């Protein structure tokens, strides 16, 4: 009898109690590159995951949701994206994981420093860079979009769990795809109204996708609420939402 493949151990965040399974990237990556970079007077740690492709790959850069999270919070995205040909850059927030400093400050500045480090890496197609921001990260991106674009203009922006209404989204001068949960209280404002406002402001195009039966961070709660202390949460990402993101980025990459 063949023994089942052992699963990597979960890492439990001592600050939040959340369990972050180690992503299983061996089959979908040719390299997992550890990257250290400076932000102010501290050194932060990130990781570039390159897909199994002999050519340079389009890059997806992640701007985190709120909380003292590490790169492992987006391990499920690394698995999905590298398996479909995208490189992905994730990093540990200040004061957590392998990053120095004290958690609780400078998140926008740290995201800019991480972006600067990400787009200079070998193995990525600098002309095909996407920014994927989630929740509070969408506000950070909107507030500092000109600074991100000065480093490298993104060919597209995906707003996961977007907090941006019609006024704030106008700051993002790039093609935009909005993905939000159907459980949001202001759903129309952050989806249809936001997309319409962006279309009125810019010629790039804006689309949106509403993830049914999901919670704010786009995990499926059709059957029961998410237990973030149980590593199986990582398997409950909303399939439709993530496929919507991949399809949209592929379309831009091919056109």
Q: What are these model-predicted stretches?
A:
Residues 12-55:
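N-terminal cap/lid segment of alpha/beta-hydrolase-fold proteins
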Residues 56-65:
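Short beta-strand element of the alpha/beta-hydrolase
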Residues 66-78, 93, 190:
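The serine-hydrolase catalytic nucleophile loop
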Residues 102-122:
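Alpha/beta-hydrolase active-site loop
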Residues 117-172:
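Primarily recognizes the serine-hydrolase "nucleophile elbow" in alpha/beta-hydrolase
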Residues 172, 178-180:
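Short beta-strand/loop motif that positions the catalytic acidic residue
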Residues 205-255:
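C-terminal catalytic histidine-bearing segment of alpha/beta-hydrolase fold enzymes
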């Amino acid at each position: 009898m063949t023994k089942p493949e052992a699963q990597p151990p979960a890492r439990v965040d001592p600050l939040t109690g959340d369990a972050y399974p180690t992503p299983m990237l061996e089959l979908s990556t040719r390299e997992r590159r550890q990257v250290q970079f400076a932000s102010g007077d501290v050194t932060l740690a990130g990781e570039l995951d390159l897909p199994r492709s002999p050519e340079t790959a389009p890059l997806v850069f992640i701007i985190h949701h709120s909380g003292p999270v590490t790169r492992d919070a987006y391990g499920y995205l690394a698995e999905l994206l590298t398996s479909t040909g995208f490189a992905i850059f994730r990093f540990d927030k200040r004061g957590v994981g392998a990053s120095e400093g004290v958690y609780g400050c400078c998140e926008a500045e740290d995201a800019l420093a991480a972006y600067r480090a990400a787009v200079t890496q070998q193995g990525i197609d600098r002309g095909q860079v996407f920014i994927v921001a989630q929740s509070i990260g969408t506000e950070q991106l909107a507030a500092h979009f000109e600074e991100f674009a000065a480093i490298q203009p993104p060919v597209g922006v995906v707003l996961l769990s977007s907090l941006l209404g019609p006024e704030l989204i106008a700051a993002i001068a790039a093609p935009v795809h909005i993905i939000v949960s159907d459980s949001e209280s202001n759903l129309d404002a952050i989806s249809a109204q936001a997309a319409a406002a962006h279309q009125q402001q810019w010629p790039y195009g804006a689309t949106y996708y509403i993830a049914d039966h999901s919670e704010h961070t786009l995990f499926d709660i059709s059957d029961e609420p998410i237990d973030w202390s149980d590593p199986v949460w990582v398997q409950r990402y909303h399939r439709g939402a993530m496929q919507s993101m991949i399809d949209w980025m592929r379309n831009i990459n091919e056109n």
